[in-house]
Amino acid sequence: MLAKFKKKYIGDWDFYQKYLLLAIPMILQNAITNLVSFLDNIMVGQLGTEQMSGVAIVNQLIFVYNLAIFGAVSAASIFGAQYFGKGNHKGHMYSFRFKLYATLLVTGGAILLFLTKGSALISLYLTDTVGNGATDLALQYGLEYQAIMMVGLIPFAVNQSYATNIKETGQTFIPMLASFVAVGTNAILDYLMIFGIGPFPELGVQGAALATVIARYIEALIVVIWAHIHRGKNRYLEGAYTGFGIPLAELKAILIKGFPLMMNEVLWAAGMTTVTQCYSVRGLDVVAGLNIASTITNLFNIVYLQLGSCISIVVGQYLGAGKLEDAKDADNKMIVFSVFCCVIMAALMFVVGGFFPGIYNTTEEIRELATSFIAVSAIIMPFCAFSHASYFTLRSGGKTVVTFLFDSVFTWVIVVPAAYLLAHFTGLGIVSIYFLVQGTELIKVIIGYLMVKSNVWVVQMV
């Protein structure tokens, strides 16, 4: 029995070495990015609760944009990984073109929305339960931050188009290096511009936004310039700019398979943002506590998020090469490994997570809320790891309609109503509400297990 389990779910060293060589650069890249976000969050937090809350709300809105970009590039990446696995560089080039067009279109829409409805969107998260005018200040700081952050959306879109194509070829080092340089720049400029160190003026939340925008341009330039210099390693760039068309067959295939994925990312992100809005009716303290907790949680969930993302690349390449049994075998082992690593990280977060809120310059009530939110997130995290791995398994085989139902439809049918009803119509404390809403992940785990086990995702599409 044990031998059978080991054969099915435990790989040998060569297997894990291949997996980790792909995953570790991505984990390190995101670890550095989230660490700098954490430091940025602390520095903004030193300015006051209103500044921290205003910035947090805008970042929540930008999160929806980021996921829309992720959805746009992921739609083409379904085919990109399989095109590369098959050696079809022209097909890979068409998927790259699609990414550029889609991300720039999404960016244009986001900028227009922020320009016309920015104030109204931020105000949705501001409920004045105390009557001290703190919400008006949070709105003011949020608008200042948002105005500058919009300038950084275009380089982010271009960078994602290039970086995802580079990763599909198995080259994860350069995107990681670019990210390291960018986040290092961001961290230094944050400190200088937020607090007015040396010749720099004290810009507060505007300084935080400027630092982020400058870093995004640097990251995009590094990735784009490297890709064009090393054409031999990035053959999808051959002819990428000599024309602008995408053959109807390829475009239709990407849209049919990818549109549900794009919509899924947008609707899921919008759903999570709506859940946060539901929590926010309990007051500005809750917004601040959630901001601190999510920043800490993001430091610990990097491992399972990136291990899950690698599943779609590895399994996608096996499927593209027609190695269907190898794809199933690798998927089983990667899911188990991802969950195992997450259990370790969750235990660590549960033990040490409560120390982090004390770093922030805020009230004791907000620190206590943040500590409770962190503990709840640690308990639920291993279940999130399994559902996340299941999602990328289904996506690797092009089952985007299934992933749409699994992810965003689940969020809007189960999670959002639960958060809304509990926050608006019960007398439960916010921590109890948060625990119950997070606990809906258990339902998703069961659904994910059944769908992965059915092998509906074992499909060669190219």
Question: What does each model-found stretch correspond to?
Answer:
Residues M1-A23, G80-G152, F200-F259, V315-I380, ...:
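Short alpha-helical transmembrane segments in multi-pass integral membrane proteins
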Residues L21-D40, I148, N159, A182, ...:
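Transmembrane helical elements of multi-pass membrane transporters/channels
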Residues M26, N30, I42, N59, ...:
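Transmembrane alpha-helix boundary and packing residues in multipass membrane permease domains
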Residues I27, A31, L35, L39, ...:
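Generic alpha-helical transmembrane segments of integral inner-membrane proteins
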Residues A31, L35-S53, I122-D136, L192-L203, ...:
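Helix-terminus/linker motif at the lipid-water interface of multi-pass membrane proteins
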Residues T49-Q60, G142, Q146, A209, ...:
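Small-residue hotspots at the loop-to-helix junctions and early N-terminal turns
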Residues M52-L112, F156-P175, G289-G353, C384-T403:
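Small-residue-rich hydrophobic transmembrane alpha-helices
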Residues V73, S77, I148-E168, P175-N186, ...:
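Short runs within selected transmembrane alpha-helices of multi-pass transporters and secretion channels
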